[in-house]
Amino acid sequence: MGTSSPEMAAALLLVMAALAGVAAGGDIVHQDDEAPKIPGCSNDFVLVKVQTWVNNREDGEFVGVGARFGPTIESKEKHANRTGLLLADPIDCCDPPTQKVAGDVLLVQRGNCKFTKKAKNAEAAGASAIIIINHVHELYKMVCDRNETDLDINIPAVLLPKDAGNDLQKLLTRGKVSVQLYSPDRPLVDTAEVFLWLMAVGTILCASYWSAWSAREAVIEQEKLLKDGHESSLNLEAGGSSGMVDINMTSAILFVVIASCFLIMLYKLMSHWFVELLVVIFCIGGVEGLQTCLVALLSRWFKPAAESFVKVPFFGAVSYLTIAVCPFCIVFAVIWAVYRRMTYAWIGQDILGIALIVTVIQIVRIPNLKVGSVLLSCSFLYDIFWVFISKMWFHESVMIVVARGDKTDEDGVPMLLKIPRMFDPWGGFSIIGFGDILLPGLLIAFALRYDWAAKKTLQSGYFLWSMVAYGSGLMITYVALNLMDGHGQPALLYIVPFTLGTFIALGRKRGELRNLWTRGQPERVCTHMHMQPSPKDTNCDAVSS
């Protein structure tokens, strides 16, 4: 409760940036280049819907994964055949089935022999397809051995996770069961990605204007203090920068190192209880961010309450407006945490996340382009390493595993913005890590602060073009995401070159790069030179520093 502390903002920045580099399309079975492709065993891995009917009445639907071998599975529901389902005897189908199949689909258990042998036995018995029940609750990719060069399997094979397979097997006790197998194609672009793009760009836009407005108010206050006399200006640094954190070169480098350690900790300790801990941390940050945003908005209409303070134990002086808003924020976060597995819980998560990002960008600042370049360049390498290169050591992408929450029963860690894919037959979410918004947002907020301080127009400044560059980079990220069959992409791989490159190129073209690089603020002629003890101080920046 109370004004957001710089220490908390810095800590939240670290937690959010640990998930800097992921934009993903949610749950999907991807192509696997490590699985061998040989003649007769070269299918792409696809998700398969298994629609069921019991006694000619439509029942549940299950989702499995198609095999590398066999014919491709029909993509159109209206073209898929509806056939009967039989439980294999023997149930593992490692020996030829004893019953007459006659075009039905065989349901078998995994184990005791190869997938290809089960499929061959089922085909020889006259089955039209085979559904294999896995012995664990996850999906598994059915592949072939490299020495199986004479495969000629002509029926599709689908693997179901253990729980889905057992439920399907129980349906057989209720009567005659028939199934329909098909694998609908995903849309090339889903509207969720468009809305996620708008959310990311809009968040940076709002945060940048708030940051620039706060900086301008600080300058106005600074000038008032200077007019009051030289003694007041001696306390300027403490008063003018209260509640703000300026990142320096050392912290920019250490930031990425510590974020890497934190990401490894998330990867190694990822479990149900650890996700619960992250939810608590996210709720604390979300309450702080939502409260800060609401107080800033409402203070214009409830100015007396915003300017009247009361001392609260452990929190110090707190405004009456903050006391009034805080319970609402706490209740909002608690309700989201309790019901976060509900269908529409993503709305609450996004509201808390956006408020948190906006607050951190308003508090944490990049002082100049040099620090911003180091921070974003390190984040760029961090992103690429943990999304792509980490596979060499961990045999999976650490960043994507953590972001999706693969080792838990959750839909992912809460430090993400997410929107459900509305027109995707497979459902799921489009997601983007907080760091993909926050880190470029720090640079873009710096651009707007500089533009306002230099009294630049929108077209002659840096903010507009940085925003365009960020939006373009994020758009390219989603193009790459779709071209790569939904594989999670390191968003900063595309965003950083666009955003930082545009900023540096414009600064160099306009001859302002040196000033942007070192000072981070324009030259300002000081109107209070008579108050300075030394004639060598020739501008207002010297006064404020």
UniProtKB/Swiss-Prot annotation:
One of its GO terms (molecular function) is aspartic endopeptidase activity, intramembrane cleaving. InterPro entries: PA_dom_sf, PA_domain, Peptidase_A22B_SPP, Preselin/SPP. GO terms for cellular component: cytoplasmic side of endoplasmic reticulum membrane; endosome membrane; Golgi-associated vesicle membrane; lumenal side of endoplasmic reticulum membrane; lysosomal membrane. SMART domains: PSN. Residues 215-246, 298-317, 365-373, 449-460, 507-545 are cytoplasmic. Its EC number is 3.4.23.-. Glycans are attached at residues 81, 147. It comes from Oryza sativa subsp. japonica (Rice). Residues 1-25 form the signal peptide. Coiled coil: none annotated. The active site is at 383, 436. A motif (PAL) lies at residues 490-492. Glycosylated. It comes from the Eukaryota. This is Signal peptide peptidase-like 4. Keywords: Endosome, Glycoprotein, Hydrolase, Membrane, Signal, Transmembrane, Transmembrane helix. GO terms for biological process: membrane protein proteolysis. Residues 26-193, 268-276, 339-343, 395-427, 482-485 are lumenal. It is a multi-pass membrane protein.
